[in-house]
Amino acid sequence: MQKNTPSRNTIRLTRRGRLALIVAGAVVAGTAVAVPLLTVEGSHRATAPATLVIPEGWRAAQVYDAVDKALHLAPGTTRRSLPQAGLKLPNDAGGNPEGYLFPATYPLDARTTPRSLLSAMVETADRRFNGAPVAAGARRTALNVYQAVTVASIVQAEAATKDDMGKVARVVFNRLARGMPLQMDSTLNYALNRSTLRTTEKDTRLDSPYNSYRRMGLPPTPIDNPGEEAMRAALDPPAGNWLYFVTVRPGDTRFTASLEEHERNVAEFNRNQQRGGPTAR
């Protein structure tokens, strides 16, 4: 860690977890894109819901659970189907579909299977992420496409609003360029399989490749399944020298290059929390 990076008990780069993952209202509205599915003839089950909505920022585990429920399957069925699913993932993914289960609205019928649903999600991601503009954007930021999806997943998890996404992406790139650890709570939340705004000193000592307080660079995989807005932010972030950000209160995320200013912002966040004000995201 660089000398200009504060100790964990002094500072928190971000105070936003993925509590919003479960709140589908506004998120779903931005992902209601109908995607046709492949189905398997001869597969029958009780009447399923007409569609399955996958919100932006859901983790793969959440997607698997949602598929099980939508198709009236025993818990864990979709996850167990992965080795036989034959998903067309990039080589860098190593068979892990995290980041490529594209958020959208998927139609269901009595013949829909976990394999057909997951395949549709991955194929949709492939169409969105593998065009020439995406490849060119990744090259501009000195990343390959899989790394760009990883950055987009962090942006999706950390940005309080779509307007913040570009700045969050710029913070990621600025810290990477300076050899600073990302110090993103969202990566720790992923490692610990949780969603929280609270990160302790003990959490930051976790021995995990997803602990961006201890490990340099990007996490080894995406940490959720980002949407197109987050991907655009990762490919073309605005210019800026920001290194820190914190959502002091809903709708008030402050970005700065100054450690002193950031510490003041974090202190204000803490005061708001102690007063029992609205949860910052």
List PLM regions with ranges.
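Bacterial extracytoplasmic/cell-wall-associated proteins, especially those involved in peptidoglycan
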Residues: 88-281
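Hydrophobic core
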Residues: 27-33, 154
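Signal peptide-directed extracytoplasmic domains
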Residues: 17-20, 25, 36-133
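Terminal targeting segments of Actinobacterial cell-envelope proteins
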Residues: 1-19, 27, 277
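Short alpha-helical interface patches
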Residues: 13-24, 231-235, 269-270
